[in-house]
Amino acid sequence: MRVRNKPWAPELIEAHPEKIVEKGQAFKGQWNQRFEKEQPIFIEVGTGKGQFIINMAKKYPQYNFIGIEIQKTVIAIALKNALEEEIPNLQFLYADGAELTDYFEDGEVSKVFLNFSDPWPKTRHEKRRLTFKTFLKVYEQILVKNGEVEFKTDNQGLFEYSLYSLNNYGMTFEGVWLDLHNSEENEDNVETEYEHKFSAKGQPIYKLKAHF
């Protein structure tokens, strides 16, 4: 997702250090200090404009959520949306998802969400896919024992690749849905911006849950 730069984005981020972190290394192993309560931490890698992570935090106050995004304007939009309400169990991290071990201690995270990630369809770009084995190794390191990954996409090719990649890594599947919105799993589903857009066009949404 490429969004035109917003001139107000840097200023908004700088104005709210209580809600967004730009130097994640400073909080490695101490993320719960940024929340009102010490609770299991769930992260979303590639949080976009924040619809998913904001609504998840509101729906599940018993968990702490961190939305991670590498594009400054995009995360500024997410921050702006989040500031419209008081959501004490939500934080944002402006950072590269490929460097999670720099920002989180081993076992500091309880769950990783990957939603509508860039499919990087060309073979030479395989290593950039967020379900490539090097990313899985990173998730395994920062997650608690038997930590869980949830992945949603509209891209059948990426989903098939991800099933193959997670299986080869030795992960255990808890569930696989080839048409999420026409399944019982959809009862508790929280949509992303992309998900709402694609499902409205009749595009099936794919989902998996797996743990290490």
Curated annotation (Swiss-Prot):
Taxonomic source organism: Pediococcus pentosaceus (strain ATCC 25745 / CCUG 21536 / LMG 10740 / 183-1w)
Protein name stated in the entry: tRNA (guanine-N(7)-)-methyltransferase
PROSITE patterns named in the record: SAM_MT_TRMB
Family recorded in the similarity comment: Belongs to the class I-like SAM-binding methyltransferase superfamily. TrmB family.
Domain of life: Bacteria
Record's function text: Catalyzes the formation of N(7)-methylguanine at position 46 (m7G46) in tRNA.
Pathway: tRNA modification; N(7)-methylguanine-tRNA biosynthesis
Transferase found in the keyword field: yes
Gene Ontology MF term list: tRNA (guanine(46)-N7)-methyltransferase activity
Keywords on record: Methyltransferase, S-adenosyl-L-methionine, Transferase, tRNA processing
Active site: D118
Pfam families named in the record: Methyltransf_4
Record-listed E.C. numbers: 2.1.1.33
Keyword Methyltransferase annotated: yes
